[in-house]
Amino acid sequence: MPVRTLFPESWLWRKFTLPKSKSGISHYPISVKVPDSITTWQFVVVSLKAGQGLCVSDPFELTVMKSFFVDLKLPSSVIRNEQVQIQAMLYNFRDRQAKVRVEFPHKETLCSASKPGAPSHQAGVQIQQTSYSIVLEPQGQTQTKLVPRQEFLNMVPDTEAEVFISVQGYTQMLTHRSSDGTYHTSKGNPGSTWLTSYVFRVFALAYSMMTTQVLSLSSLCDMANWIIIDRQAEDGHFLEKGPVVMTSMQDGYQGSEEDVSLTALVLIALNEGKELCRQKNLMASIERARGFLERKLPDIQTTFAVAIASYALALANSSQANDCLDSFASPSGCGMLLNQPQSWSGEGVISNPAMCYSSLSVS
């Protein structure tokens, strides 16, 4: 039987130009050889067209299987003279039973019962042991090194992917922290709503992934508490009182109905950390922000604002999440094709963040 060795988690990444078609529907046949994984693959096509935007197709599923195959359960590593057990599991999906013989191939470098002739055994010899006492007096302070989780072993397709996050620059980030727990763009400036919510979102995501907790949960939740108490208005939207140094860092929400876009950004961050910070005012704040966006949604005019508001409402489980986004889609029936230009950096193009938020809101 052929040996299966190719087990990628993703593999089909191709870029091609669709031919023109009078009917408006183009076809591009391709022939590929699927990997050795016995699983179900999902294919999604993303297309771009000048002057129109982004189109995402519905997922197409392809099931790969073999009627009969052998699965060897091998250890992840073996050292010299170690005794290991190799188990062979046979899978038969045929309509009839099969009588087979599983034989381990003989190798000179391996000591196995499959070796022809009398089996050998390992001899023992006496070992002289000498002990020394050593006093260690380490200099300096204790140093800690964080090692991210590494659980790649036994990962196969159709298994929920592990999320691996490397958190760097935590101490440098603390230099932008004010005495009240907020974050500012430079010393002397008041806390920034956008920057504090962004830091809260990143740290909330990193908190659950750290093997050794270096992030204080109380300080993390204090950020959310400050945003809610100090920067949220009665109608649910969030205010920005800190100066904006680089508008390009803010995903392009400057000039895109800022009250809506900023509220959506903060709502996304609060949703990321709601499982960690369970204070009562957090869920009440999320409800007020969701209500504000739902009231504003029918009147939104800019592409970025409707994209990020739709994604924020989708995270908040709002039934109105895609009500306005559909009106920005192309009437050609494409999955998601934004047809309203968004001015960004002086060019009449749709910003990449707007495309990403649009795709996330319908995924």
Swiss-Prot record:
InterPro entries in alphabetical order: A2M/Complement_sys (IPR050473), Alpha-macroglobulin_TED (IPR011626), Ig-like_fold (IPR013783), Macroglobln_a2 (IPR001599), Terpenoid_cyclase/PrenylTrfase (IPR008930)
Molecular function GO labels: endopeptidase inhibitor activity
One GO cellular component term noted in the UniProt record for this chain: extracellular space
Domain of life of the native organism: Eukaryota
Any Pfam family hit: A2M
Classification via PANTHER family: MACROGLOBULIN / COMPLEMENT, VENOM FACTOR
Name of the molecule in the record: Putative protein C3P1
Organism: Homo sapiens
